[in-house]
UniProtKB/Swiss-Prot annotation:
Pathway: Cell wall biogenesis; peptidoglycan biosynthesis. The keyword Cell wall biogenesis/degradation applies. This is UDP-N-acetylmuramate--L-alanine ligase. It comes from the Bacteria. Cell wall formation. Its EC number is 6.3.2.8. Its main location: cytoplasm. It comes from Burkholderia thailandensis (strain ATCC 700388 / DSM 13276 / CCUG 48851 / CIP 106301 / E264). GO terms for biological process: cell division; cell wall organization; peptidoglycan biosynthetic process; regulation of cell shape.
Amino acid sequence: MKHIVKHIHFVGIGGAGMSGIAEVLVNLGYQVSGSDLARNAVTERLEALGARVSIGHDAANIEGANAVVVSTAVRSDNPEVLAARRLRVPIVPRAVMLAELMRLKQGIAIAGTHGKTTTTSLVASVLAAGGLDPTFVIGGRLTSAGANARLGTGDFIVAEADESDASFLNLYPVIEVITNIDADHMDTYGHDFARLKQAFIEFTQRLPFYGSAVVCIDDPNVRQIVPLISKPVVRYGFAADAQVRAENVEARDGRMHFTVLREGREPLPVVLNLPGLHNVQNALAAIAIATDLDVADTAIQQALAEFNGVGRRFQRYGEMPAAGGGAYTLIDDYGHHPVEMAATIAAARGAFPGRRLVLAFQPHRYTRTRDCFDDFVNVLSTVDALVLTEVYAAGEAPISTANGDALSRALRAAGKVEPVFVATVDEVPDALAKLARAGDVVITMGAGSIGGVPGKLAQDTQQKG
């Protein structure tokens, strides 16, 4: 590609999916520019690496670019997209650019409705501990690397494969992971769950004859498609027919302790520095891949025991002062689908048994809130206290029957928790100050702007201290 394309421009360069690819391309020696609506830590990092970042979208920003990269979040009437069309500069979907990177190395693509970011991070960490020095592109900040992407010298690139817009079908990896299949982003698939499952089957058809599909056999929808996968399959999970299986699972001190059974191998005792059964499954995917690539068991154990997590995935902010004295534990999580939320709540209950659980939740997208309305009511009813904000629209038009007020009314009718409704995220800190008590576990949760709340709480605490 480099003999033709020298300068690559990213529209929305500060986004989690775009910034990682941009960083790898900078490190490969490409001239990279980009634009976004606001400056953040990610754009500042890219600028420090040599990328040119413009704040605001303007046709002039793409000057000199040989290609313009866009995600599905970028509107077709964006001035930079219109300028690229007018100048006949190729407009490249994000997934297609990721596919180009995968052509340079052997790709390991992590797919599934939930758990992609954590699983991708675990795979990258285990391979790095095994000396394979992988390139990785992750949808969240890997704490140990201080970034969501890195150009390694090894043969492998580990990346998330996004099913939300079916763009994962652009990828041709040599190893694939399918963590689970659940009803989300159903607009892409015409609200037809069979079409969604078929897309995952087609994803496995991108594998070469020597490739493998590493699948979580605990998930009933994944189990249904396994007979339809024509390439070699490695099953992981808790089920009896898993080829990489966890047993003797125990939660202790915020960590998961378990033993891994693999065909033809000695039992492997593992301590995972993450809470929750869902994270044990994510770790099993990494163990399955590492075993296949002959990573030493000691390296696997070390990487999982020392795993420092990913930004906004059960990210611990420490102890915050409660208004009545004492302190509460603050955690932030990206969960925005009822299944993910239930897993995080269960992990918190396991990590902090007997403690009161307070959740501040910002729903993400009106369509998701509409499609999963009853499931949201059910999962939100399992916490001890709740702050609920208006829906983060993510560009969608409001739906009056699926907004924050409608969800609040349904929760009150269910009668298990009394939600404190706030119209904006800016009101969350004050609401939590009134609600949180000493000894509580407080989780801020959602895929929208609520991600800025825990940092503000921590900063305010630091300034007062």
